[in-house]
Amino acid sequence: MNYQRLEKLGEGTYAHVYKGQNRVTGEIVALKVIRIDADEGTPSTAIREISLMKELRHPNIMSLSDVLQTENKLMLVFEYMEKDLKKYMDTYGNQGALPPSQVKNFTQQLLKGISFCHENRVLHRDLKPQNLLINSRGELKLADFGLARSIGIPVNTFSNEVVTLWYRAPDVLLGSRVYSTSIDIWSVGCIMAEMATGRPLFAGSNNEDQLLKIFRLLGTPTEQSWPGISLLPEYKPTFPIYKAQDLAYLFPTFDPLGLDLLRRMLRLQPELRTTGQDALQHAWFLTA
């Protein structure tokens, strides 16, 4: 084995992640060690992650440099990144909140990475601060493609058990099983808002609570504002009626252009949400 483990960085449902070193070159890397179950074989999440990450080469996507397999373990070798965005905010933020220039910089990098995924017909489906990694040069990269999916033509019927609850789009929460790149854009909007305040935008405790938190801020949708919403499995005609709040009041650090982009990403109706490419062309990124 050409790599030695230096320290444990974390663990997930099916893998442990270590800081490691290439014994030959001395390069510091991240090692994701996946247990292979004797009965079940390699987890489908690992197979998906490997196949997608081998194809997705971009400065804002974590690069997978090697895959090594033994009888009961699979080891993925990634470039080493110092912190995830959550830890970065906790370390350098003012009570977690980052300065406006940094929010803009990280939002732009995040949009570049996710737009590249979307151009290559891949949905990430699990964007959250813990899955965005930052290195010592301030480069932000998308990681953890274990839930990612290729977009089929026509749109596949995907499972609605995706994306950590707080970053989950309202259409997914309402049980829609036909969705596209717009679910990732919703997550980007939630992350952009969280970077500005240091707090998750919608920290719901369950599916319905999550929806009501969204409606409290953005207004309760109706059949008029979102045609077809009443047909979604989790829609209830008894949802409380909330009026949309003024985002400028909640996000005093955003200028009008920043607020405009945030609103475009957080449109309740998925078809009305901006795309990654359009978001990158937004005037907010053209101002200092």
From Swiss-Prot:
Single GO term (MF): protein serine kinase activity
Which residues are recorded as binding ATP? Answer: 9-17, 32
The record places the active site at 126
Bilayer-spanning residue ranges: none
Q: Which segments constitute the Protein kinase domain? A: 3-285
Residues modified as Phosphotyrosine: 14
What does the subunit section of this Swiss-Prot or TrEMBL entry state?
Interacts with the pas1 cyclin.
Reply yes or no: does the keyword Chaperone apply.
no
Q: Which InterPro entries match?
A: CDK, Kinase-like_dom_sf, Prot_kinase_dom, Protein_kinase_ATP_BS, Ser/Thr_kinase_AS
Question: Which residues are modified to Phosphothreonine?
Answer: 13
Taxonomic superkingdom:
Eukaryota
Q: Name one GO cellular component term.
A: cytosol
According to UniProt, the name of this protein is Serine/threonine-protein kinase pef1
Q: Which reaction does it catalyse?
A: L-seryl-[protein] + ATP = O-phospho-L-seryl-[protein] + ADP + H(+); L-threonyl-[protein] + ATP = O-phospho-L-threonyl-[protein] + ADP + H(+)
Annotated source species: Schizosaccharomyces pombe (strain 972 / ATCC 24843)
Keywords, A to Z, come to:
ATP-binding, Kinase, Nucleotide-binding, Phosphoprotein, Serine/threonine-protein kinase, Transferase
